[in-house]
Amino acid sequence: HPLRADTIMIGFSERSSPAAIDNLTRLVFANTAITNIIIVVMPKENTAIHLDMIFTQVDRELCVVYPPHFVGPERLTILHWKKGQSQVREMPNVFAALQSLGLPMEPVFCGGDRRNLQEREQWASGCNFVAMRPGLVLSYARNDATLREMEKMGFRIVSSTGFLTGEARIADDERAVITFEGGELVRGGGGPRCMTC
C-alpha cells in the first residue's frame, strides 16, 4: 500500500518469508524514493492472506480496518523499517507508527462495533476497497455495517448503476463509496482491490 511518496505499508504473511521481506525492502530503498516501510505481521488465517483484507486506506487520513487486528489486545505486530537503519523497530500499533511519520490515520471499523459483524464482513471483503482518488472508493454493496460506518465519516453511498447511468453525480471534492454487487466474487474469495491487479 503506498501511503505517501516516501512511505509504503506491506503485509508479511505466511505466503512470504523474512528473506523475501529483506530483499523487497532493500530493492525498494535502493530504487525508489521510499524511505519508510511499515510492515504488518499478518495472522495465519485464510481470511487475511493479503493486507487489503484487513487494512485499506480510503482517504488521506482515513483507513478501513478489521478492528481485532489493529485495536486492543489481539492487535498484530507492527514494524517500522527506515532507510539507512539496519534493524526494524517494533511499534505499539499501526496508528502510532503512522503518527510517528506525520501520517495520522483514523480508523473506520469494518463491521462497526459488533464483533460478529466485524468477522462476517471481514470475511466478505469489508476492508477491501479500490481507491479511485482520496475519498472516492469502490466496494461491495453487501457489507451494510461497514458502509454505515463510512457514512458516519461523511461518505455518500452510491450504487454503481446510479453512477453509471448518471442518476448519481459525485463532486470532485465529495467523499463517496460506489457500491456494486459481487456475491459470486465474494464466494470465490476475491475483494474489489484484489481484482485490480
Please report, for each region that a protein language model flagged, where it lies by residue.
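The feature marks the mature, well-folded catalytic cores of soluble enzymes
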Residues: 1-197
